[in-house]
């Protein structure tokens, strides 16, 4: 009959921690299954069971008892196996402690997880969203565009090169279509061309541009060999020469705003002087009616005038005089022509007065000769 050992007198030897590890891992796996949604990494905790710790407390007594009963080693071995089989309650309590420990860890984990999650939230508050950054960038671009629009340009040219050519060509076309010079009716010429200009031009701007183009041509014409930097300048000069040249279509360049030229006023003065000469003399020269000397637009009057001979009498070659006369602007030529014609009219008037004076003196001589007695 086997001897039953009292567990108090002969406690079982402390087992290794392998069983506790297995129990703890089983408890950790159970807890991991329940909290898989909260934790991704399984928690492995090693906790020794109380039976193991309590059993490990009196090792000396167990060794003493075991030495006293060395002969009964076989029975002790059987008793140890029986005690191990009777220890499941202690192992169960170890599992319970492991589960409680895991549950405590779970209760502490939400705070740590919330703390870790709170950090990105704080960082996200400091970082500016991409949409807000894009809106700020677009606002800056709009402000830059507005500033670039508000900045005034240095010099804005109203008349383009095409507009200048259009004005010159328009003067030629107006003369060809209407048969009148653009200076005769400036209002009609303005209405004829204003819609073709690239901008809304006023009457004053239109006339100022014509005067500036003529002035530019006169400055070029005074040179022996005018040079041109651009093809536009050369084309403008050729058109201007066709308009304001010696045989241009706008010979009556000195035009007032009402369309009456200085030349017409000078003609009226000459006509009045000639009429007075005719009435004072009692008859016209050679019995013929005095004709108006309005000048021939087809030829240059200077070449056939006495001015060339008078200037040449001072020691200057006639050919050189005529050549230099061709370099004078059309406007200056017209002024000289008008003055020369007025001077000729005054010369005729002086000749008439001189003739009257000589007639009176001759009449006195005749009367004196009649009253003188004849010598015997």
UniProtKB/Swiss-Prot annotation:
Task: According to the UniProt record, list the residues that bear Phosphoserine.
Answer: 49
GO annotation terms (biological process): glucosinolate metabolic process; regulation of DNA-templated transcription
Is the keyword Acetylation in the record?
A: no
Biased composition, class Polar residues, residue ranges:
87-103
Q: Where is this region: Disordered?
A: 1-150
The UniProt keywords, alphabetically, are:
Phosphoprotein, Transcription, Transcription regulation
* Top-level lineage group: Eukaryota
Q: Where is the composition biased (Acidic residues)?
A: 17-40, 73-83
Q: Where is the composition biased (Low complexity)?
A: 49-72
Coiled-coil annotation: which residues? none
Any one Gene Ontology cellular component term annotated for this protein:
nucleolus
User: Which GO terms of the molecular function aspect are on file?
Assistant: transcription cis-regulatory region binding
Subunit info here reads: Interacts with DEK3.
The entry sums up its family as follows: Belongs to the GeBP family.
Protein name, per record? Probable transcription factor At1g61730
Q: Which organism is it from?
A: Arabidopsis thaliana (Mouse-ear cress)
């Amino acid at each position: 009959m086997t001897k039953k050992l009292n567990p108090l007198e002969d406690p079982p030897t402390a087992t290794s921690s392998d069983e506790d590890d297995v129990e703890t891992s089983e408890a950790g796996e159970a807890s991991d299954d329940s909290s898989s949604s909260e934790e991704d990494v399984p928690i492995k905790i090693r906790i020794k069971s109380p039976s193991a710790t309590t059993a490990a407390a009196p090792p000396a007594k167990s060794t003493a008892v075991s030495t006293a009963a060395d002969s009964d080693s076989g029975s002790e071995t059987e008793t140890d196996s029986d005690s191990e089989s009777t220890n499941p309650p202690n192992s169960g309590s170890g599992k319970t402690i492991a589960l409680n420990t895991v549950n405590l860890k779970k209760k502490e984990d939400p705070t740590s997880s919330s703390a870790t999650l709170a950090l990105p939230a704080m960082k996200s508050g400091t970082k500016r969203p991409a949409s807000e950054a894009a809106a700020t960038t677009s606002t800056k671009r709009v402000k830059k565009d507005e500033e670039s629009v508000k900045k005034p340009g240095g010099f804005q040219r109203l008349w383009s090169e095409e507009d200048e050519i259009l004005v010159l060509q328009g003067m030629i076309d107006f003369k060809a279509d209407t048969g009148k010079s653009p200076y005769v009716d400036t209002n009609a010429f303005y209405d004829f061309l204003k819609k073709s200009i690239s901008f809304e031009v006023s009457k004053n701007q239109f006339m100022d541009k014509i005067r500036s183009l003529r002035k530019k041509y006169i400055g070029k014409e005074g040179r022996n060999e005018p040079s041109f930097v651009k093809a536009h300048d050369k084309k403008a000069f050729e058109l201007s020469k066709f308009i304001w040249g010696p045989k241009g279509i706008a010979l009556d360049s000195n035009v007032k705003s009402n369309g009456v030229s200085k030349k017409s006023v000078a003609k009226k003065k000459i006509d009045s002087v000639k009429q007075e000469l005719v009435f004072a003399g009692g008859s016209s020269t050679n019995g013929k009616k005095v004709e108006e000397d309005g000048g021939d637009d087809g030829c240059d009057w200077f070449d056939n005038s006495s001015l060339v001979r008078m200037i040449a009498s001072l020691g200057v070659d006639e050919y050189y005089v005529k050549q230099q006369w061709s370099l004078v602007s059309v406007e200056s030529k017209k002024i000289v022509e008008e003055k020369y014609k007025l001077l000729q009219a005054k010369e005729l008037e002086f000749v008439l007065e001189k003739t009257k004076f000589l007639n009176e003196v001759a009449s006195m001589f005749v009367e004196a000769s009649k009253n003188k007695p004849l010598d015997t």
